Amino acid sequence: MDVYEFYWRDQIKGYQLIGGLPERRKNPARVTQESVINLAKELIGDHVDANDIFFIKITKDENTGKILRPDPVYRPLKEYLRDRRRCPRMYMDLPLEYRVGYGSYARGGIVVDASETGFLIYSPDGIPVGTELKIAVLFPKEYELEMLEVSAEIIRKTFVAKEEKGYQYGLKFTQILEEDCRKLRELLQGSSQI
């Protein structure tokens, strides 16, 4: 089992262990810079700077907990937190309309973020993972509203509690026309990266 151990670099004592976390892809909770810094503040105090936090990757035996392979190099925290996706996600917050299959009625939702390969959307409706959706996203372009249409499959579903309860869905595009792909790229260029 791979584990990341986080260390705080003390000018006098050297590297001091803060704690360990499982590999990111196996960890359902999002590890953020703030969460690691808050953990460090609990243990060390308020004088913690993100530039003084480092991590190493170690391999542990799952049964005994014995360290099998420690990584000898301490790497900066920002390297652990960098986005490793092939296509980076961009924050959107745009209205969308979707249909489940061809004959169903339209339902509403919000695009939370997007990349060239998919969307993260919010919807109050419960839809099973694996469902194919036909999606139309509305966005402003100069003084008009444009529409971007894609087909996508739900690959992840998470319950969220906002003002009204609902779900976040991770969607992977299954079909997108070249014109809509161009619109998406333009939209992504004007958005801020997560």
Task: Give the location of each predicted region.
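Short strand-loop-strand
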Residues: 94-134, 168-170
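Short, Lys/Arg- and Gly-enriched loop/turn segments at beta-strand edges
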Residues: 141-149
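N-terminal acidic leader/helix
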Residues: 1-28
